[in-house]
Amino acid sequence: MPALSGPQYLGEGLKLIMRPGLRLFVLIPLSINLLVFALLIGFAMQQFSHWVDLLMPSLPDWLGFLQYIVWPLFVLLVLVIVFFTFTMVANIISAPFNGFLSEKVEVVVRGRDDFPPFSWAELLAMIPRTMGREMRKLAYFLPRALVLLVLSFVPGVNLVATPLWILFGIWMMAVQYIDYPADNHKLGWNEMLAWLRSKRWACMGFGGMTYLALLIPLVNLVMMPAAVAGATLFWVREEGEKALVR
């Protein structure tokens, strides 16, 4: 079943990034992720209670008992938003390195090197393209996230905001990471989304496992490059090259 095959890519990706030849391409984005994580968590710890109070609806006294039921939902909602912010910022900053990591993983998996050799000049040349692609992801993400954020403030409706955020987050994890190998092969944005939709259940399986792994503090720092490697395996084994427009 596709939904069951998707999660295995993350575990295999974790094994791949432990190989000596890939460690250099893991250490650089890992260091970036660590810095972003430390800064964001420090800020979030100071503001966490305020954010939960801001999102929590005001209940009349006779419904006060419901506060203890809905409070965990809003704590989870804040955690999900913090998670999204960290993932988005870290991936934007480390995008060129993630692109190179995806290239090298594909070389290992396929056993042949169809990409230019690594050089700092090549990395610098990738920055405009990868940043442009990250901005395209941001343009896809922000309007949908804004709708969910507005729903989070609507009394009653905000009770379903958390599960909607989670489902959207699972899909975005697939989009975020599988786009690295797709972009390396110059697959257009709309074509990439169409291909992912054709693999919807496998994508949700991979995205769901990635989502869960990235929610775990500190573990998520290692799992981000593992997700890049796993997404590259997904691209190769699910025959992503067939989506390329010749």
UniProtKB/Swiss-Prot annotation:
Keyword tags: Amino-acid biosynthesis, Cell inner membrane, Cell membrane, Cysteine biosynthesis, Membrane, Sulfate transport, Transmembrane, Transmembrane helix, Transport
Which residue spans traverse the membrane? Answer: 24-44, 69-89, 148-168, 214-234
Transmembrane as a keyword of this entry, yes or no, is: yes
- Main site of residence? membrane
Q: One Pfam family of this protein, by short name? A: EI24
Subcellular location field: Cell inner membrane
GO biological process terms on file:
cysteine biosynthetic process; sulfate assimilation
Which InterPro entries does this UniProt record tie to the protein? CysZ_sulfate_transptr (IPR050480), Sulfate_CysZ (IPR022985)
Q: Its Gene Ontology molecular function terms?
A: high-affinity sulfate:proton symporter activity
Membrane topology per the entry is: Multi-pass membrane protein
Task: Spell out the GO cellular component terms annotated for this protein, sorted alphabetically and separated by semicolons.
Answer: plasma membrane
Q: Does this UniProt record's set of keywords contain Isomerase?
A: no
Top-rank lineage group of the source organism = Bacteria
Q: Which cysteines are joined by disulfide bonds?
A: none
Biological role stated in the UniProt entry: High affinity, high specificity proton-dependent sulfate transporter, which mediates sulfate uptake. Provides the sulfur source for the cysteine synthesis pathway.
Q: Which family does this protein fall into?
A: Belongs to the CysZ family.
The protein's matches in HAMAP family, at most eight in alphabetical order, are given as: CysZ
Q: What is this protein called?
A: Sulfate transporter CysZ
Q: Which organism is it from?
A: Pseudomonas paraeruginosa (strain DSM 24068 / PA7)
Lineage of producing organism: Bacteria, Pseudomonadati, Pseudomonadota, Gammaproteobacteria, Pseudomonadales
